């Protein structure tokens, strides 16, 4: 019974430390700040959250227009979510941007997510497209 209670207490402690906490924008890694300044210049930062667990850090920057930008612990972007509004495309690999423009004219990218193996974009018509890294078309799904 003691072991069981110890495991429960340890789990509760770990969970409590893994929650988002509000931080200042200048605490985001410089790479992340440069990304925000370059691609979202005129939009103001609303709030910044740090998700810090024992294994990794993740920064979430919420802009005044509702856009959310997530960074890993080094400040590399992981996700940009325009919440159904178009996002800037200057940071998106050219092969992906060109494929979307050519294959889905009159649409805009509203969300992009990246991990080590793939990039997924979501368009304003709700179509999602996955690309294997490096930038090879993978699949389209609705």
Predicted segments, located by residue:
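Bacterial Sec-dependent N-terminal signal peptides
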Residues: 1-23, 36
């Amino acid at each position: 019974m003691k072991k069981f209670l110890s495991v429960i207490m340890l789990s509760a402690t770990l969970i409590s430390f893994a929650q988002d906490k509000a931080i200042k924008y200048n605490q985001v890694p410089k790479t992340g700040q440069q990304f925000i300044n370059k691609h979202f210049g005129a939009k103001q930062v609303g709030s910044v959250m740090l998700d810090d667990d024992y294994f990794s850090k993740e920064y979430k920057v919420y802009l005044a227009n509702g856009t959310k930008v997530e960074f890993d612990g080094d400040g590399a972007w992981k996700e940009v979510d325009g919440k159904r509004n178009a996002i800037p495309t200057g940071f998106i690999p050219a092969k992906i941007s060109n494929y979307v423009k050519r294959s889905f004219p009159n649409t805009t990218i509203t969300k992009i997510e990246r991990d080590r193996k793939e990039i997924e974009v979501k368009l304003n018509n709700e179509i999602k497209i996955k690309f294997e890294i490096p930038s090879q078309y993978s699949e389209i799904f609705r």
